[in-house]
């Protein structure tokens, strides 16, 4: 007997019916693809954040470091020249170069002009792509011991490991996020200090590389610039260091007098106060305090 339509199959599927033999085959063929994608992702993370920079020989004439100071054109001409001469003298002793952009060189919108520090460093990296170190120093500071090179004084791996402050709150006094208990000196790309208020960004060193570019781009994110941080880029830096492990993993905090001695400290602390022979004297706060004059305070040390 013939039917007009094929007989209807039962909609009931036996609970123990064998699955199609194609499914395990497809899983087996796709597994290498998944593993490959995972391996590629892991490699990218390693390349960006964990791998030590491959040693390459820079072109002849490449400076060992760039000293970056951002200049406010509203400062007096004599003050600006004194700051520049201080950096130029230091740079000439060690084969470094200087870079003095103005705060007005970068489009900051409504953000405070102190944000210009970040694009200035990024700009310097573009101008000197093969240079090892970028040393940012605020215009309220002087280099007081020009005999100290960045490498021997701080950045040599064994020296840097001995200086690094480990397992301490990133933002004093009671941040729950602490510095790593151990970092290899050759994997540290960002060096700075703390003061009694938090991270002290007036003097810092960046090692050139893809990570440094990533860090500066992250720090200069429009979201942070538009957010009303009380201390602008300083508080933005504290935020990203504490909550982005890829940045904390490259950061070394060193004792304040190694890189950023203050000439006075209103908190009463003395461990960060400038002593003759220190690398840097920072007249921290002299621009914000109406009762202080940076140029007058610096004059005895120029």
Residue ranges and their predicted role:
Residues 119, 197-302:
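Catalytic core and acceptor-binding pocket of nucleotide-sugar-dependent glycosyltransferases
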Residues 75-77, 99, 107-109, 142-145, ...:
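Eukaryotic short linear interaction motifs
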Residues 63-64, 94-97, 130-133, 139-140, ...:
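Loop/turn elements at helix/coil->beta-strand transitions in domains of secreted/extracellular proteins
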Residues 78-83, 103, 148-150, 204-205, ...:
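Short coil/turn segments at secondary-structure boundaries
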Residues 16-130:
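N-terminal anchoring/stem segment of glycosyltransferases
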Residues 1-25, 33-43, 54-64, 153-178:
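Fungal intrinsically disordered, low-complexity polar regions
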Residues 113-192, 198, 203-209, 213:
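GT-A fold catalytic core of metal-dependent nucleotide-sugar glycosyltransferases
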Residues 70-72, 101-104, 137-139, 193-195, ...:
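Active-site-proximal beta-strand/loop segments in catalytic clefts of secreted hydrolases
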């Amino acid at each position: 007997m013939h039917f007009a339509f094929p007989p209807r199959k039962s909609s009931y599927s036996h609970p123990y019916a064998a699955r199609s033999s194609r499914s395990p085959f497809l899983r087996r063929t796709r597994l290498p693809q998944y593993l490959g994608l995972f391996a590629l992702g892991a490699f990218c993370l390693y390349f960006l954040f964990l791998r030590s920079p491959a040693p390459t020989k820079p072109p002849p004439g490449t400076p060992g470091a760039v000293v970056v100071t951002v200049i406010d054109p509203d400062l007096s001409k004599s003050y600006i020249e004194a700051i520049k001469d201080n950096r130029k003298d230091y740079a000439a002793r060690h084969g470094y170069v200087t870079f003095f952009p103005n705060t007005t060189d970068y489009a900051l919108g409504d953000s405070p002009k102190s944000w210009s520090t970040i694009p200035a460093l990024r700009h310097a990296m573009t101008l000197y792509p093969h240079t090892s170190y970028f040393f940012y120093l605020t215009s309220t500071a002087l280099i007081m011991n020009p005999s100290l090179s960045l490498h021997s004084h701080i950045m040599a791996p064994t020296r840097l490991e001995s200086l690094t402050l480990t397992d301490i709150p990133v933002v004093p006094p009671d941040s729950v996020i602490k510095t790593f208990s151990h970092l290899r000196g050759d994997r540290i790309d960002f060096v700075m200090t703390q003061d009694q208020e938090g991270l002290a960004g007036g003097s810092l060193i960046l090692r050139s590389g893809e990570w440094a570019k990533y860090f500066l781009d992250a720090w200069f994110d429009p979201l942070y610039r538009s957010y009303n941080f009380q201390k602008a880029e300083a508080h933005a830096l504290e935020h990203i260091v504490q909550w982005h492990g890829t940045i904390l993993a490259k950061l070394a905090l060193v004792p304040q007098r190694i890189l950023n001695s203050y000439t006075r400290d209103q908190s009463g602390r003395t461990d960060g106060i400038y002593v003759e022979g220190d690398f840097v004297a920072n007249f921290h706060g002299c621009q914000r305090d109406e009762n202080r004059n940076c140029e007058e305070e610096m004059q005895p040390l120029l």
